[in-house]
């Protein structure tokens, strides 16, 4: 157990500017996670001391821990002593020890109980480093380098601030840049709460966190820390207030000016104010009797027990640092018949490093994801719920299909492995009325010039039949700036379906409309994407190259995924029925029920030269159905129903389609 801490200051100190005489500063007496006491005086024989403030659950501290370990080993040979300092009230000694062991830190990590040392130094965030020269004056404070920041993952650093400061001090030169801005997690300081705050954790804040945060911020999930109890929430309270005020959390990037979404993650103005008031009052706990019941989470699968679980056939290795290209993993489910999927869930094998997963169906004859092949099936991203389709709606996977997983990983400071899984819940085909269909707007001709800061790309999708739009998902890579989905209706109207003005590659959101939106036949869904290939984009892997379409992160994509159903489809009506004749031909019976009363209905298709030789259908009967029977050869036949001589309609009871115009298809062996 960490004992009380004494931090003795010989004098208050300030940062030394170039040319100033360093002033004596401090000594401290702090315990590490093992209970060993350390003082600054123990480094009296060292030329330089580095105090690195870290938080064991801060993602940036995780990213920089291996680098600090390397620096400590390299500069330790030259007379530089490193100390880690953890001032977070929520970080205990056992957890600090696990962090130090995981990252193989060759220096002690000291527990700054009561954040006394952090207060004296003015440390605000983690990771933040302080460099003390031989007289133990602070000659540099700030970031380690510029590779990582909030929403920034450069391939490598362009400024090596800590290294430059150490080299200058060791060479006897003034530090050229004695202070840099630190980004990262706010230190979880101990505060003195107001005795009776108007807003308390127990009565108010716990409910907000349960509704919006703890799905991810709980043990075993993607978030780097938990927010399931008061101690954790209080330790992160100032950081919570910051990310809420800045709109970074909960992650939601749709403009509020357009569209309504069932999975809108935003906090209300009342909820935001409650968090601000709570933090301003010192984060009071309140009466534990006011706490809401703890939320119940399904352990493991969050969908009903899967009928099929597909596991990646191999482990994926994730490096400790840097970035890694997309991984494409193909799985053969060995389907001998069509299956209908009513619910699906991607379960990351290692949630800490799985950035996102997109799952596609590759029907027989399709071996890659492009505008001709690859059907969207499922997705995973932090905070994205499992896909549970409405009653009567299901996704069909044809027999013989393969499953393709597109995975993106984020290194987290240590080497890791992942083997993710996909769970599928099947639906009885007899209960399926509508097939979930997928489409995409796709620009394969991207040619983003070097240095272009606002390259515009456009792509469209045309609804060839009356449809109901359910959800959309914008996808770009590191140069993506924004994407907008606009529906252009046949009557000349246009409507913004989704506007993402600030696209973030770190968050792959599926935007589910609160109600299915009708897309009349002929509606064109336009997507306009903007890209920044300039050096001003900190995530840009290489602003000097022409960027084209490609699956790897260094390349770019302009993809607008969309999920929809056909408005008049009712698979319960059934597909055409057939009977094999003695001569090898088939007698096929077609039925059709028009949406509105019709004067006439005819059967047309490849076997009638379409409108050249239409087959009149008899009807309507008492139920309003039209029917006809024709004789066809074996093979595949496309067809539609011609209503009143000028309106082509697909077969609402047949899930098989073919071609750009989604002609209904019947296969006769």
Task: Go through the PLM ranges and name each one.
Residues 28-49, 194-203:
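A short beta-strand-turn-helix
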Residues 177-335, 356, 400-406, 411:
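Aromatic- and Gly/Pro-enriched helix-to-coil junctions and flexible linker segments
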Residues 112-188:
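Thiol/selenol-based redox catalytic cores and closely related redox-interacting motifs
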Residues 62-103, 110-120:
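Structural microenvironment flanking redox-active thiols in thiol-disulfide oxidoreductases
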């Amino acid at each position: 157990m960490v004992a009380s801490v004494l931090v003795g200051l010989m004098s208050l100190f300030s940062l030394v500017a170039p040319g100033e005489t360093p002033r004596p500063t401090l000594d401290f007496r702090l315990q590490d996670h093992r209970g060993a006491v350390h003082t600054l005086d123990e480094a009296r024989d060292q030329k330089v001391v580095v105090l690195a403030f870290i938080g064991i659950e801060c993602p940036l501290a995780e990213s920089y821990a291996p680098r600090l370990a390397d620096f400590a080993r390299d500069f330790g040979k030259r007379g530089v002593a490193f100390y880690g300092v953890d001032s977070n009230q929520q970080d205990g000694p056992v957890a600090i020890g696990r962090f130090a062991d995981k990252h193989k830190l060759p220096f002690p990590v000291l527990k700054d109980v009561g954040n006394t040392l952090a207060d004296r130094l003015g440390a605000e965030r983690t990771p933040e480093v302080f460099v003390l020269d031989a007289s133990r004056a602070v000659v540099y404070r700030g970031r380690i380098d510029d590779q990582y920041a909030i929403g920034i993952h450069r391939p490598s650093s362009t400024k090596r601030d800590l290294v430059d400061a150490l080299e200058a001090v060791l060479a006897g030169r003034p530090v050229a840049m004695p202070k840099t801005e630190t980004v990262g997690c706010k230190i979880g300081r101990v505060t003195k709460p107001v005795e009776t705050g108007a807003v308390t954790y127990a009565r108010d804040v716990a409910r907000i966190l349960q509704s919006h945060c703890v799905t991810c911020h709980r043990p075993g999930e993607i978030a780097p820390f938990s927010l399931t109890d008061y101690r954790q929430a209080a330790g992160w309270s100032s950081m919570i207030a910051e990310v809420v005020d800045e709109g970074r959390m909960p992650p939601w990037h749709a403009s509020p000016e357009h569209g309504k979404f069932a999975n809108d993650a935003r906090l209300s103005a009342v909820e935001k104010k409650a968090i601000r008031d709570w933090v301003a009052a010192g984060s009071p706990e309140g009466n534990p009797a006011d706490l809401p019941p703890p939320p119940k989470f399904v352990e493991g699968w969050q969908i009903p027990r899967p009928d099929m679980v597909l596991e990646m056939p191999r482990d994926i290795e994730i490096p400790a640092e840097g970035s890694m290209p997309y991984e494409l993993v193909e799985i053969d489910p060995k389907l001998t018949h069509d299956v209908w999927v009513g619910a699906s869930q991607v379960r990351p094998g290692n949630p800490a490093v799985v950035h996102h997963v997109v799952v596609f169906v590759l029907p027989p004859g399709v071996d890659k994801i492009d505008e001709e092949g690859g059907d969207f099936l499922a997705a995973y991203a932090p905070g994205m719920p499992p896909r549970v389709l409405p009653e009567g709606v299901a996704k069909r996977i044809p027999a013989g299909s393969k499953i393709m997983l597109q995975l993106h990983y984020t290194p987290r400071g240590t080497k890791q492995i992942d083997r993710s899984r996909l769970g599928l819940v099947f639906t009885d085909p007899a209960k399926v009325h509508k097939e979930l269909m997928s489409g995409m707007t796709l620009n394969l001709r991207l040619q983003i010039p070097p240095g272009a800061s606002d390259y515009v790309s456009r792509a469209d999708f045309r609804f060839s039949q009356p449809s109901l739009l359910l959800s959309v998902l914008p996808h770009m890579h590191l140069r993506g700036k924004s994407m907008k989905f606009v529906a252009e209706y046949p009557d000349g109207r246009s409507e913004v379906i989704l506007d993402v003005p600030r696209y973030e590659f770190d968050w792959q959101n599926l935007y589910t409309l609160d109600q299915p939106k009708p897309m009349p036949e002929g509606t064109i869904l336009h997507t306009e994407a903007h890209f920044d290939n300039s050096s001003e984009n900190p995530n840009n892997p290489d602003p000097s190259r022409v960027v084209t379409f490609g699956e790897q992160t260094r390349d770019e994509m302009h993809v607008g995924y969309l999920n929809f159903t056909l408005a008049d489809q009712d698979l319960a009506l059934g597909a055409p029925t057939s009977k094999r004749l003695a001569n090898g031909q088939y007698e096929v019976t077609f039925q059709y029920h028009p949406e509105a009363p019709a004067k006439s209905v005819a059967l047309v298709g490849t076997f009638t030269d379409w409108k050249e030789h239409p087959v009149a259908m008899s009807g309507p009967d008492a139920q309003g159905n039209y029917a006809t029977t024709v004789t066809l050869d074996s093979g595949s036949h496309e067809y539609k129903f011609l209503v009143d001589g000028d309106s082509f309609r697909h077969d609402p009871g047949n899930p098989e389609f073919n071609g750009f115009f989604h002609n209904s298809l019947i296969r006769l062996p």
